[in-house]
């Protein structure tokens, strides 16, 4: 089933100049990038985005990291995009992510684990809406 997922290249990916290498993997796999832009999260947006982690031991570090620099956000489209992209990015903790996955190949620690991708249809819809207006997403 053709579907859309939301992907963010986190501040460490931009700082380390990995944007091209990561996008290349999605294009090589056969996905279409139907929306993309550069953003910088402010504290309010980061807190809204990571609401579920409020109160956790790593929350402050996570918010500081996510607001530390610019990011790339995109909408990736293709067959089973949500589950396939999650597989391609690898486990949340890069030390446990398999080699061959994006986190397995490019990261070693959290919260600076390079990339985020939606983990369900509901979160994909929510996250795409949070970052893109309808007319910023292109079908053709
Ligand atoms: N134990 C931890 N210590 C530090 N940072 C963490 C830890 N666990 C998660 N994080 C950070 O919070 C983010 C969100 O965690 P979550 O458990 O939702 O994982 P995820 O769904 O793989 O991540 P993301 O939402 O970024 O794709 C992680 O990607 C990572 O940057």
Swiss-Prot record:
**Pfam families linked:** NDK
| InterPro entries in UniProt | NDK-like_dom (IPR034907), NDK-like_dom_sf (IPR036850), Nucleoside_diP_kinase (IPR001564), Nucleoside_diP_kinase_AS (IPR023005)
Keyword Transferase listed? The answer is yes
Which UniProt keywords are present, listed alphabetically?
Answer: ATP-binding, Cytoplasm, Kinase, Magnesium, Metal-binding, Nucleotide metabolism, Nucleotide-binding, Phosphoprotein, Transferase
Which PROSITE patterns did the record assign?
NDPK, NDPK_LIKE
Query: Could you say which EC number(s) this protein's record lists?
Result: 2.7.4.6
Q: Name one GO molecular function term.
A: ATP binding
Where does this one sit in the cell?
Cytoplasm
User: Which parts form a coiled-coil structure per UniProt?
Assistant: none
Q: What is this protein called?
A: Nucleoside diphosphate kinase
């Amino acid at each position: 089933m053709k579907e859309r997922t939301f992907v963010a290249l986190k501040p460490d990916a931009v700082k380390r100049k990995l944007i091209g290498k990561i996008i290349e993997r999605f294009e090589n796999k056969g996905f279409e990038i139907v929306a993309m832009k550069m953003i910088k999260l402010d504290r309010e947006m980061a807190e809204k985005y990571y609401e579920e982690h409020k109160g956790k031991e790593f929350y402050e570090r996570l918010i500081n990291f996510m607001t530390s620099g610019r990011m790339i956000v995109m909408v990736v489209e293709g067959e089973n995009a949500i589950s396939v992209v999650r597989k391609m990015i690898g486990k949340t903790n890069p030390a446990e992510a398999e080699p061959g996955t994006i986190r397995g190949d490019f990261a070693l620690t959290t919260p600076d684990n390079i990339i985020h991708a939606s983990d369900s249809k509901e979160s994909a819809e929510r996250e795409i809406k949070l970052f893109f207006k309808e007319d910023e997403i292109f079908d053709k």
